[in-house]
């Protein structure tokens, strides 16, 4: 019979509660039952006094880390990011692009698609395309030279280059063609976010009804609020 393993720590962030100090069972690398009482018998106890144990963090919007940028298009840089993030408690992430040329974004998507299963630390769960379908009024750090309306053919080229791992894309809902674009890519399993936008409430509603489900840079990269026009 395989020896049971438990980890002791001061605090555990469980599914619906925070408990501790206590012991958490580990079976084949997976967390099991929690108990406040010290396990007895033939068991292995890993002691982490003074430590907190929590599920790994998921970073869904990250452009770079450890002096590396996703838009550098550097496979080794992506690996360095992965290692660095794991040391911060992040166990999975979505490398995030910036607005750039169609060709550059294709290259970046391809590079991440080729390396994502080889990273040594935090796992890559997909790619987040932040842009280029934004508007200039709230461009932030995005380059408006490459802004344009959502284009399914272009997006599918990026998706093909990535090997199908683009999982999220942000756009401005006032751009032409948004409704069809959102409906299509959400049906394909891609999460659509709204951001860097000067849309009215009505324009945003169209995108939400079409399937958009995330808001990016709320209250700073968006139209201002007014008591007669809620933005």
Predicted segments — roles?
Residues 1-40:
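N-terminal metal-binding scaffold of metallo-dependent hydrolase/deaminase domains
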Residues 10, 24, 29, 50, ...:
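Divalent metal-coordination and catalytic microenvironments
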Residues 63, 79-108, 122-135, 162-174, ...:
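Divalent metal-dependent hydrolysis catalytic cores, especially in the metallo-beta-lactamase
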Residues 64-76, 141-148, 191-195:
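Active-site mouth loops of central-metabolism enzymes
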Residues 74-77, 108-111, 151-153, 228-231:
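Charged helix-capping and loop-helix junction motifs
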Residues 135-163:
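Conserved phosphate-binding/catalytic loop of the ribokinase/pfkB sugar-kinase fold
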Residues 160-231:
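Active-site core of metal-dependent hydrolases
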């Amino acid at each position: 019979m395989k020896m049971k393993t438990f980890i002791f720590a001061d605090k555990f962030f469980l599914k619906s509660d925070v408990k501790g100090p206590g012991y958490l069972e580990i079976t084949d690398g997976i967390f099991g039952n929690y108990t406040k009482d010290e396990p007895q018998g033939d068991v292995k106890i890993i002691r982490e006094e003074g430590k907190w144990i929590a599920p790994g963090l998921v970073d869904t919007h990250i452009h770079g880390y450890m002096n590396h940028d996703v838009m550098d298009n550097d496979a080794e840089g992506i690996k360095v990011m992965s290692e660095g993030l794991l040391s911060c408690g992040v166990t999975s992430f979505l490398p995030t692009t910036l607005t750039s040329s169609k060709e550059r974004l294709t290259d970046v998507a391809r590079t991440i698609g080729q390396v994502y299963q080889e990273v040594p630390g935090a796992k890559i769960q997909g790619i987040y395309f932040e842009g280029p379908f934004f508007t200039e009024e709230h461009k932030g750090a995005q380059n408006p030279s490459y802004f344009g309306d959502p284009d399914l053919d272009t997006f599918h080229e990026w998706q093909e280059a990535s090997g199908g791992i683009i999982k999220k894309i942000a756009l401005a809902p006032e751009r032409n063609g948004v409704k069809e674009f959102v409906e299509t890519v959400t049906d394909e399993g891609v999460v659509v976010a709204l951001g860097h936008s000067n849309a009215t409430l009505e324009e945003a509603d169209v995108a939400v009804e079409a399937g958009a489900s995330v808001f990016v840079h709320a209250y700073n990269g968006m139209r201002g609020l007014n008591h007669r026009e809620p933005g």
